[in-house]
Amino acid sequence: VYDLYDLGEFDQKGSVATKYGTKAEYLAAIHTCQEYGIDVYADIVLNHKIGADGTEIINAEECNTGNREQETTGIEQITAWTIFNFPGRKGKYSDFVWTSKCFDGVDWDDKQKKNSIYLFEGKEWDKDVDSENGNYDYLMGADIDFSEPEVIAELTKWGKWYLDQTQVDGFR
């Protein structure tokens, strides 16, 4: 949920290997499964990002954690971890930089050192989601805004790249 392009190839967040090993080990595991007739489907998290590289000052409303459709404050400035520029990858495969424009909200205000759910000004939670907690679009981290054309374009580009790199049978 940090860098979708890093399959265990770049020194990022203190390690080159991911929880699946290096890129070579990951690709070998996929290939070995397929050699034995096992279809490989990757379980990819596309809802949110965690582990940002920098912060931005953003206007947001704090939401009721029991009902995310209810704001508990007016608009206030928060400091949110929303910049993802992947310095370890240095633009290889994609130079897209994720900023607050790419997200609906976060769960941490670094200014107040406060954990809560914050909806960015001018944004809304997705509608076609479970109604638990009023609206269960928000789960954790920086919630990706799928109404932004640049986000859709980047994730589409990544999906094609990922299928080409890994040769998996699909992903969800």
Predicted regions and their residues:
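Substrate-binding/active-site clefts of carbohydrate-active enzymes
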Residues: 1-166
